[in-house]
Amino acid sequence: MAKKENRIVITLACTECGDRNYTTTKNRKNDTNRLELMKYCPRLRKRTLHRETK
């Protein structure tokens, strides 16, 4: 039996417009909370808060 992977692929969605602009990986063991990063939103043309989505 293979062990369950710790690193998973997640998508980051803009909190202002709702677009899913970025994908990244996170370690399931070290980062149990939802990831929040300030990233550039091409639709709004400014830096906004992006949150992890399911």
Swiss-Prot record:
GO terms for molecular function: structural constituent of ribosome. One of its GO terms (biological process) is translation. The keyword Ribonucleoprotein applies. Keywords: Ribonucleoprotein, Ribosomal protein. GO terms for cellular component: cytoplasm; ribonucleoprotein complex; ribosome. The keyword tRNA processing does not apply. Belongs to the bacterial ribosomal protein bL33 family. NCBIfam families: PRK00504.1, PRK00595.1, rpmG_bact. This is Large ribosomal subunit protein bL33.
